[in-house]
């Protein structure tokens, strides 16, 4: 399906190019790839669609980094449904941590928070942990007699990681200001993401002060306790400059292609890309 859509995109784009113009760079980003794709990965996804020598396949976090930092040294921390951190040093070398997915524990992510919350409710029910309003809240939402009833719900194939992330968001709105146990889970999430960020920076050899740290994803954007703990953890180790990405993640591959084609990345170009993306986004939503 991915190959089919990519093929359609190329054939739709080429006739729209101004006369005598041609595509000189193809950049594709995909989940499940750490940094640069292997030859085998590139062949399976891009083979016979794009000119081989003009094509680059990278992980979606690499594209996200380009969109966030415009290719300059810095750190991108993505903490939403999953957690992924990438640091780019002065030599344009990348160090990537996280991004393993829910089964291998994306620490601090919305999925991680939801699982921790359910576990806290189980501990409350079994008497092995503190009392928490998480228990009664889950029972009310899922119309179950006690927390044991949540087992068939969360193990159902349709209860995917996105639904765990939605659950974390709902819990934050309901209990974020009132329940000590839930608040502790959120603080732990932010602290753990902060620690992983510090480790990533130290492994990358990036040495800039203040350290440019770009953050995105629902946990760091909307969960106030997680965000505060994340920032405090970072500031204990580095002088940091926190901000949101300069461009939407989806434009990261565009940034890579422009840079590799020798196009100068100016503020005017960045504003133009942002404007074009917003206009297209509004058209598709309309």
Regions found by a protein language model. Name each.
Residues 34-136, 274, 278-286:
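Phosphate-binding/catalytic loop of phosphoryl-transfer enzymes
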Residues 31, 106, 160:
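Glycine- and other small-residue-rich loops at beta-strand/loop junctions that grip anionic moieties
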Residues 30, 99, 217:
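Pocket-edge structural micro-motifs
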Residues 9, 30-33:
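Membrane helical hairpin/interfacial module
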Residues 1-24, 47, 68-73, 119-286:
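ATP-binding/phosphotransfer module of carbohydrate and carboxylate kinases, centering on a glycine-rich
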Residues 33-35, 221-222:
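Glycine-/small-residue-rich active-site loops that bind phosphorylated ligands and cofactors
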